């Protein structure tokens, strides 16, 4: 299911329609059932590549983050130390994707969105995808 968020005064709310549930399969590891991903797409080309932009915003804080997986795209586990929210951020296909985890709340997602908008000075379209 895909929902395009209305650009209301002050921007999107980042309300989370589906929370993923963490499961621990017998064979080991962790899996998630259900998902919500916010897909952010700049409406004009930013001055720097999206991966560099995301890394700069994360480095400037208030974030602790790591890109700990060897994947063909950047995937960061992010903690906003201001809001306490933890979520994943990926960069793929000209978009920045915010992946909700079980305890993620809207303020952390909104804060990263606001920092991307402030850093680029361009509008961003926001799409909410649920599974």
What is each of the regions a protein language model found here?
Residues 1-131:
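Acidic, polar-rich N-terminal leader regions of halophilic archaeal proteins
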């Amino acid at each position: 299911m895909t929902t395009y968020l209305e650009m209301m005064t002050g921007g999107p709310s980042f309300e989370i329609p589906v929370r993923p549930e963490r499961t621990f399969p017998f064979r080991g590891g962790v899996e998630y059932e259900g998902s919500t991903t916010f897909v952010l797409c700049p409406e004009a080309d930013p001055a720097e590549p999206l991966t560099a932009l995301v890394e700069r915003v994360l480095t400037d804080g208030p974030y602790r983050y790591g890109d700990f997986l060897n994947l063909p795209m950047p995937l960061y586990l992010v903690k906003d130390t201001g809001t306490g929210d933890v979520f994943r951020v990926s960069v793929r296909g000209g978009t920045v994707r915010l992946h909700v985890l079980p305890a993620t709340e809207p303020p952390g997602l909104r804060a990263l969105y606001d920092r991307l908008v402030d850093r680029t000075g361009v509008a961003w379209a926001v799409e909410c995808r649920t599974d």
